[in-house]
Amino acid sequence: MVSQDFSREKRLLTPRHFKAVFDSPTGKVPGKNLLILARENGLDHPRLGLVIGKKSVKLAVQRNRLKRLMRDSFRLNQQSLAGLDIVIVARKGLGEIENPELHQHFGKLWKRLARSRPTPAATANSAGVDSQDA
């Protein structure tokens, strides 16, 4: 069974890792007030990065709540996302959505992302940015 923790190795930590996902995403899943970008990472576990700016979500309380919900949802669904670097970009209005609706929305988005993954043969030529290079 895959552990459901959110340890340091499951986070995108450096600007270089974020840039790799932004520059060449292999998967894009637009959602209500957010965008999920994903890229193969060549590892056996997924990694998550969050982008929630003050322009999109004004109050720090709301930004922190969103980050907590996003991390928790990722943690519970990471078994279907193995081998991906994922960046979630928040957009205006995301802070006004209630927690149950957000949880439901993220469940659907993770399923869409898992379904939209390219086949392993298609990604054999693209090399991921792994955490040992940092």
Swiss-Prot record:
Top EC class, one word: hydrolase
Q: GO molecular function of the protein, one example?
A: tRNA binding
GO cellular component terms, alphabetically, are: ribonuclease P complex
Protein name per Swiss-Prot or TrEMBL: Ribonuclease P protein component
Q: Which keywords does this chain's UniProt record carry? A: Endonuclease, Hydrolase, Nuclease, RNA-binding, tRNA processing
Encoding gene, per UniProt annotation: rnpA
The family note in this entry says: Belongs to the RnpA family.
| Reactions that this protein is recorded to catalyse | Endonucleolytic cleavage of RNA, removing 5'-extranucleotides from tRNA precursor
- InterPro entries (alphabetical): Ribosomal_Su5_D2-typ_SF, Ribsml_uS5_D2-typ_fold_subgr, RNase_P, RNase_P_CS
